[in-house]
A protein has these predicted regions:
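Phosphate-rich cofactor/ligand-interacting catalytic cores and adjacent structured alpha/beta frameworks
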Residues: 241-264
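Short, surface-exposed recognition loops or helix-turn segments adjacent to catalytic cores
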Residues: 220-228
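Catalytic glutamate of the conserved HExxH
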Residues: 130, 134-138
Length: 440
């Protein structure tokens, strides 16, 4: 019997593309494990799917009657893109500053501006997708914070019953990735073929119009490699993350398949069944090909350090998975309520810190303090020339009580710069105005 694994000539050439793909995947993994989103990409896209038929599509048709099936499918791709846009900067060629601003500064105002600025069906779908990310992070991060504390007793002993992303980024990455993987293992998410059928699109023109209105900075000045960032993010969403999920599933599948039914889970599964149109649930993930098995073997023995830490996730416990399922139900309920407010032109979004779900204020969260200081410095460098009255009011309100323990105070030089920049802003700013009108 001939057991030759690789013969000369054509067989060698046939393995080269796979070797290149493995190398590419490993390289991008090294570059991309830094997201602070409450949910991973698959969950964000699933939130859109859960309300697509009953809520989102009717909104699109109400504003843009007569859409064809192809136009609706294309709009679905833009909704997917909007659902993950706040995390774009955390991927290769992105800008952490871009995503930090959307997470910690005027998070509600940004989504509101996308809705106001949208001009066609794809831009509108993109904005509605961004609204789903807002709902997801506000509802999802508190659950993830609690889950991290449950899964990591040492962190719970140090930080209490809720561990924030800034307090242990690796633990958050492992927990979030674990949640996505267990849902895939149990065939709950749309197949890769379905996501390929829909696609993934980013509305750059809408971003370019809305971003400077909200943050007083041109998009190109923050996201300097915009096309490369969007392209690499599209690859990560459509190929890398599903591939890494399959690899994780291959190494953890026995433990992940166990079910513990309860009311919250039954509600979640019922919602999944109602959104089950034109889908094959998860089959692409539970039948790994040869390439996935080889990559799984390689990564199984890779030291779980640095960017590979996320692949060493702890399987969710029944308690933490229940928290996750409840947070999904809460997210869907909240997103549905927001979409109804969009329909009735009554939408008002609070500016919340995405990592905690709490209203944004100074000294509430370290990354928020740091991000405000960086934005203030950037605006001051340009003499606040693009800062709207609303943005000026927002910054002055954030720094209205300088007695609280703002994170920036730990750097004396930087804090003195903040005080100087605030004086310059106060000299330019008119009296504070009332909050803006609802979005439509």
């Amino acid at each position: 019997m001939n057991h030759t694994f690789m013969s000369k000539g054509a067989n060698v050439d046939s393995w080269r593309p796979f070797a290149m793909r493995v190398g590419t995947v490993l390289l991008i993994v090294l570059m991309s494990c830094s997201s602070s989103s409450a949910y991973s990409v698959l969950t964000h896209e699933e939130i859109v799917d859960l309300l697509w038929t009953d809520q989102i599509q009717p909104l699109l048709l109400k504003r843009f009657p007569g859409l064809t099936e192809d136009q609706i499918r294309e709009a679905h791709a833009y909704a997917y893109g909007g659902a993950v846009i706040q995390d774009l900067g955390y991927y290769p060629f992105g800008s952490r500053e871009f995503s930090d601003l959307m997470h910690y500064v005027r998070s509600g105002d940004f989504v509101r501006e996308l809705l106001l600025e949208s001009q066609d069906v794809n831009e509108y779908a993109f904005a509605l997708g961004a609204l789903s990310h807002y709902a997801s992070d506000i509802a999802g991060h508190p659950a993830v914070n609690q889950s991290v504390a449950i899964q990591y007793p040492k962190l719970r002993a140090k930080y209490g019953k809720s561990v924030r992303y800034a307090q242990d980024k690796t633990a958050h990455l492992k927990t979030e990735f674990g949640f996505d993987t267990v849902q895939v293992a149990k065939n709950r998410y749309a197949s890769q073929q379905y996501h390929d059928f829909i696609g993934f699109q980013v509305s750059k023109s809408l971003l370019e119009r809305a971003f400077p209105v909200v943050y007083g900075v041109e998009l190109k000045d923050v996201l300097t490699h915009e096309d490369m960032a969007v392209g690499s993010y599209r690859y990560a969403v459509s190929r890398l993350i599903p591939q890494m999920t399959k690899v994780a599933l291959q190494t953890h599948k026995k433990d992940l398949m166990r079910e513990t039914p309860n009311f919250a889970k039954r509600k979640f599964l019922y919602r999944l069944s109602r959104s089950n149109y034109e889908k094959e649930w998860g089959k692409d993930y539970v039948k790994p090909g040869l390439g996935t098995r080889i990559l799984s073997a390689l990564l199984r023995y890779m030291p779980k350090i640095g960017p590979f830490k996320g692949l060493a996730f702890n399987n969710p416990t029944p308690q933490t998975e229940d928290l996750y399922i409840k947070s999904i139900n809460t997210t869907v309920d909240q997103y549905r309520a927001f979409l109804e407010e969009v329909r009735t032109d009554t939408l008002v979004l609070a500016n919340c810190d995405f990592d905690t779900g709490q209203p944004t204020k100074a000294a509430e969260y370290s990354l928020t303090d740091v991000t405000y200081a960086k934005l203030l410095a950037r605006l001051a460098d340009h003499k606040f020339d693009l800062a709207s009255p609303e943005l000026r009011d927002n910054i002055l309100q954030f720094y209205s009580d300088l007695s609280v323990p703002i994170e920036t105070k730990k750097d004396v030089v930087r804090w003195q710069a903040v005080l100087t920049e605030l004086d310059h802003l106060k000299a330019l700013a008119p009296e504070p105005t009332l909050a803006g009108s609802p979005a439509q």
